[in-house]
């Protein structure tokens, strides 16, 4: 803008470039300012909320079931291991009755070594 003296002057903030100061200044539209507080939910929002609650409930149930199943499987594996150890000890006792103790001990060590190699 150029004033009467011929000097160029920078437009003040808030005034339009055209210089038409009689027009109202507009503020930018902000969606958050238009939200109505305490409004009732629409049927779609209710359905969405119910769906979310159902999903969370099912996830909790699934987590509980998984935890229960893990405990059950741990118990089963523990029982299997115990039975295997017991069976192995009984077998060694039967062998010890037939053979010399040192020979049985050597056999036991050899079998453990073979088992360790096999598991690699």
UniProtKB/Swiss-Prot annotation:
Residue ranges with Basic and acidic residues bias: 81-96
Segments of skewed composition (Basic residues): 97-113
Domain of life: Eukaryota
Presence of the UniProt keyword Magnesium in the record: no
Record keywords: Coiled coil, Nucleus, Ribosome biogenesis, rRNA processing
Keyword Hydrolase: no
Induction: In response to cytotoxic stress but not genotoxic stress.
Segments of this protein annotated with the region Disordered: 1-26, 81-120
Biological process terms in GO annotation: ribosome biogenesis; rRNA processing
Residue stretches in coiled coil: 47-106
Compartments where found: Nucleus, Nucleolus
Cellular component GO terms, alphabetical: nucleolus; nucleus; preribosome, large subunit precursor
Extra remark: Present with 2340 molecules/cell in log phase SD medium.
Annotated function: Involved in nucleolar integrity and required for processing of the pre-rRNA for the 60S ribosome subunit.
Entry's family note: Belongs to the CGR1 family.
Protein's name in the database: rRNA-processing protein CGR1
Species this protein is from: Saccharomyces cerevisiae (strain ATCC 204508 / S288c) (Baker's yeast)
